[in-house]
Amino acid sequence: LRFVRGLIDSADLPLNVSREMIQESPIFTAIQKGVTSRILSELGKLAASAPEAYAKIWDNFGAVLKEGIYEDFERRDALLALSRFKTTASVNDWRSLKDYAASLKESQTAIYYIAGDNIARLEVSPHLEGFRARGVEVLLLADPIDSFWVSSGASFDGKPFKSITHGSADLALIPLLDTNSKPSCEIDQSVTAFLSFIKAELGDAVSDVRASDRLMDSAVCLIAPESGPDRQLEKLLAGAGRLKAAAKPVLEVNPHHSLIKALASLGDDDHSFKQDVAHLLLDEARILDGDRPENPRKFGDRLAHVLRRSLLSARV
């Protein structure tokens, strides 16, 4: 609550106050706890009685309040109740976790979120496709502190927070809104073989290559492995010099995408072409994730090779 300024009148305070006294005095500790609890209580009343006025406070100081979720375990539940979020259900207006809980799907076991640098980029992330297709609301988190408090074991209404860019999607039990658009559960044998080819070609650039159940329209995306941190948290830790070695990402491939099926149908004569495509798919996933190709020169050469091949095929 460092954005709050005020005066406190107490007969128990000595006239001479030192920094050591502020840090060690039980009186100051009691005052701090009492004032903090009172302010949070008043904010809760304001949020309930005048949501528009509270929204203005959240616009200006929401990121600071969320620091308390990470640092103040005692008041975590109160701060979560006060928190407001942009979501896939409401990009223009703030939503509370109580609102989110009311829209949970029957088989939904977690509060899903995606973290990044800005809301506009998060809105178009391919990771959202499978969740949107099922009507599952996802929190859009764009403040740096978000990546830390969601990974600190916080939960709301008995539901943990789960990143949609980390590990498995857990969407199998939630039905699609449009049952006619449901892809086949079976994956073509040629696609399975192509995924194995991609994994072998990319080597240690990725930890795994696997079929995705979170992609609907996009061909590929990058996922953080179960054993590592969320993708955005990893970027923040690396930028602050607090990450010794980044975990190798998982490349998820949409096995029902027309491009993937077409590439999987290519014969052995197209080996070098398929090698270039495997690396281009990884670079595409990096770009969609907000990163750059690891080697821009090789990316350009491979792209030129694939485009030339496409033009020659079109003339035949």
Feature names for model-found ranges:
Residues 1-316:
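Conserved GHKL (Bergerat-fold) ATPase module
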